[in-house]
């Protein structure tokens, strides 16, 4: 693993902006002209601690222009709320959409930050009535909140989980309706899609998304690409990642360069066909 002195940032993500978007995406900035593939997703697509995340690997392999619109901890809301991002996506030949987790979006039980979707803003009256013993002001992140609620009462938590999954289905339909070009849905995870998903743990990402939910979204997509990372790639861990000693624990929770190679292997052929002809 690569370390730099504490307090320094070993990777320059070359943050850039497209149009009037308030989001700073990973650079270098590219022109939204000609034929290109747009990659929408979360921390993995952004490539935190990764010098060449899978969109960059695909670009190098195929010669296609691949524009990285990954945003750390993105839920569906951040994409729906950004008109400039949607316009950029609609200018592409194809959009690769990394399937997002279900907890990072506003719903009937709580509200999240419109751009930093992992930030919990406030719980609804309904949530407070279900969990009257929980002080919602103690929580700032959705994952922390949901982990605590599940621990307090697994039975009551089923109501929360069901709401997240229902909202995810509806919001995914809306997002894909607003993308007017072919969409490839990407399952990029350390585990295969499961029939049950009720844990907010990072290792379970995309959290609360089940195999049935993926199948519900399939008819709206050009195809679904399943990149369930191999045991060998998981065993490689943080090898090749770049982070400070202070960031080591965070880096260890993310998929490493070997996993990104597998994602590029799966996506490169279809990107080459659709973008390069």
Label the model's feature ranges.
Residues 1, 37-41, 98:
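Short, hydrophobic/glycine-enriched beta-strand segments
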Residues 1-4, 55-60, 142-149:
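A broad, low-specificity signal for short, low-complexity segments enriched in glycine/proline
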Residues 6, 16, 21, 28, ...:
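Generic signature of intrinsically disordered, low-complexity segments enriched in small/polar residues
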Residues 10-72, 78-90:
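Serine-esterase "nucleophile elbow" of acetyl-processing enzymes
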Residues 1-13:
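Helix-enriched interaction subdomains in cytosolic or periplasmic regions
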Residues 76-77, 194:
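Short secondary-structure boundary/hinge segments and terminal tails
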Residues 87-277:
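Alpha-helical cap/lid subdomain in secreted, periplasmic
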């Amino acid at each position: 693993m690569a370390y730099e002195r504490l307090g320094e940032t070993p990777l320059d993500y070359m943050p850039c902006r497209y149009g009037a978007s308030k989001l700073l995406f990973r650079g270098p900035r590219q022109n939204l002209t000609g034929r290109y593939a747009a990659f929408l997703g979360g921390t993995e697509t952004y490539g935190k601690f990764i010098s060449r995340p899978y969109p960059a690997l695909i670009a190098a392999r195929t010669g296609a222009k691949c524009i990285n619109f990954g945003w750390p901890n993105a839920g569906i809301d951040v994409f729906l709320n950004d008109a400039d991002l949607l316009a950029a996506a609609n200018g592409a030949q194809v959009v690769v959409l990394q399937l997002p987790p279900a907890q990072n979006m506003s719903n009937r039980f709580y509200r999240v930050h419109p751009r930093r979707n992992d930030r919990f803003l406030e719980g609804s009256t309904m949530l407070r009535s279900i969990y009257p013993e929980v002080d919602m002001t103690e929580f700032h992140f959705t994952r922390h909140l949901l982990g605590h609620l599940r621990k307090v009462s697994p039975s009551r938590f089923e109501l929360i989980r069901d709401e997240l999954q229902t909202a995810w289905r509806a919001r995914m339909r809306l997002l894909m309706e607003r993308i007017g070009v072919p969409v490839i849905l990407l399952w990029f995870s350390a585990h295969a899609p499961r029939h049950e998903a009720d844990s907010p743990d990072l290792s379970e990402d995309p959290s609360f998304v089940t195999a049935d939910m993926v199948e519900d979204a399939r008819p709206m997509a050009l195809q679904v690409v399943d990149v369930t990372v191999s045991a060998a790639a998981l065993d490689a861990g943080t090898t090749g990642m770049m982070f400070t000693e202070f960031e080591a624990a965070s880096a260890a929770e993310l998929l490493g360069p070997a996993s990104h190679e597998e994602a590029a292997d799966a996506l490169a052929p279809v990107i080459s066909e659709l973008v390069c002809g």
